Structure formats: structure tokens, C-alpha cells
Amino acid sequence: MSRIAVVTSHPLFASSGGHLVIANALVTALQEFGHEATVVLTPQNRFGRQGAAYLSTWLMDLGQAYDGRPVDQVISFRYPSYAIQHDSHVCWINHRMREYYDQWPRFSRSLSWRARTKERVRRALIHAADRYLLEDCVTQVYAQSHTIQARLARWGRLSAEVLHPPPPPRPYRCDRYGEYVLVASRLTPLKRIHLVLEALRLPPAQMVRCVIVGDGESRDWLIGLTKEYGLENRVTFAGQVSETELLEHLANCRAVCFPTTEEDYGLVTVEAFASRKAVITCTDSGGPTELVCNEKNGLVIEPTAKSLAIALARISEDSALAESFGVAGLRQVTAMTWQRAVDRLLLV
């Protein structure tokens, strides 16, 4: 039996993100396969103090536990958790600090010249630190998607094998193909939930109902759009829900819509498949497009309101189509096992 520390950063008072769900799922899998495992959370400081978060993580001692026994291996996730020092260190990365990588143009656009200059310096330092840590201080790097793998290669010329996370070990089920499409996501601009609302107001999708699960900075704006578009009778904002409530929605929705842009992975995709539900996503959605095969287990459409409206209408009007896609998705995700993931991640 090995003793494994699963390490990830997490913002203070933030609700559980996908990285934390995957970390906890990995711990559960490790324990089921006879190992001793725990999640270790490292700081993720606000802008201007990222260096301190990297340093404090670098100085954290994970060499041995309270009882004097050694920690045999570390498996880290997102920045700056991979700054942990350990002789047996695998990084299963879901992302670096995206504001300094693929999201730099969007992030820096609104900054003053003075702030942009300061952030350029920080960006260069973070790039250098990330490359050193992932190239020289980690035994093995796995990317959670081909999208992440491509970013590592583009910014830093870092190589990584791809290992998609399986669905978390939850009691998924399919009760029916109900009368609404489910959106389960943080409500932030990159998730592009407004595209769903814009699609629902178009003629093809004017009979489609939608339940939106999740919370975030865009919530008030999205609620305002819903009222502006006259969609109050067809769109329900369920807010942050428990795991039980999420599984209930997955079991009873017609399909899952995830129109995100440049997503790292998109855990809801495999959770939908595990619930025998189709997924609608967009051609530029990143991670989900690696799993959703157009016209086989879901629909991959252009990121326009018109295309999404047509896709929503097709799924909503044809329960047999939704079911056939869902069955194909379940078949695909069944092959993604935690046994395989653990076998690849373990060095000891």
C-alpha cells in the first residue's frame, strides 16, 4: 500500500470546481485500490501575489506525514500546486494561470498601459517558473485533454501525454428524457451561457425549456437577459445545487448543453454521458469536442445562436434521437475507467 498526496490549489471560499471534484474522485479511486490517499490544498493568491503562492507551495514539506511515515508520491493538478517538491511527482495538469497564457489578450485588453507593463513582467516570471517546474521538477506530466496538451506545447514547448479524467464515482442514472435541456456550469463569460439565451429567443427553439445550474459572476447579467428576451417562463436558474440535485437533473433532462469556449476539459461532458444523455457543444469549445462526436453521441455546432437554436430544437423535438446519442455516450464513457487512470498516474 502506497501513501499518495493529491495536491491542487483552490481559491478561498470558492465553491467546488472541476479540478477539486477530479482530485477527490482520484483520492476515492486510490483508496478503493488499496492505497492511502488524501487531498492537499495549496493557496491560489489574488493578482499581484501569485509569486508568494508559488513560493509557499515550493516550501511545503510533503516528504512525510504526521506519523513519520514517508509520503510515497505526489500527484498535482493546477497552478501553483505543481510547485510542490517531491522525488516522485506526477502532474495531471488541467491548466496553468490562463490569464497569462491563452487568455492574455482578453485579460490585458482592458488594462492601462502601466498595469499592462506590470502584468507583462509578472507574466514572464510565471512563464519561466512554470517551465522550470514542469520540465525539471516533475517526474511525469499528463494533460487532462488534448486542448491542454496543445497549450503546453505552444507556450513553453512542454510535452505531455493525454489522460482524460473519467466521470467521478457517483450514482449516475437515466430516469427519462425529460422536457428540458440542462446547462450545468459556472456562470462566467468564458462559459458562454448567454449564447443559450440568444438561441432560445429564435423561432426554431421557441418551444425549448432550459434549466441552468450553477453560479458565478455573470448570474445577474444572465437573469437580466432572460427578462429582456422574455424567457422567464422557459428558463429556470437553479443556482448552486448539491451533488444529489445535480444527479437528479442529469437523470431527468433531455440533454446537456455546454457551449463553452476554449474549455480545458469540461467534466460535465462525461457526467452527461454517464447519465446516458447527449451533449450539445460548439466547434471552438476545446475539451468537450474531444469527447463529443457530432451526430453520434451529441451535436457539435458552430458557436452562433442560430446553429444552437436548431440543435436545441432537434434534441427537444426528437426524444429517440436524444436517447440514441445518450446510449452512444454511455458506451464511450464506460471505457474510461479509474483503474486505467490510476495505473498510469502511479509511479510507486
Summary of predicted features, one role per range:
Residues 240-241, 248-253:
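Short alpha-helical donor nucleotide-sugar binding micro-motif in glycosyltransferases
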Residues 173-202, 211:
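Conserved donor-binding/catalytic core segment of Leloir-type glycosyltransferases
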Residues 223-241:
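Nucleotide-activated donor-binding/catalytic signature segment of Leloir-type glycosyltransferases, i.e.
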Residues 110-141, 149:
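Membrane-proximal helix-turn-helix segments that form the acceptor-binding/catalytic region
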Residues 314, 321-335, 347:
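A short, well-ordered alpha-helix in the C-terminal region of glycosyltransferases
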Residues 278-282:
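Short hydrophobic beta-strand element within catalytic cores of glycosyltransferases
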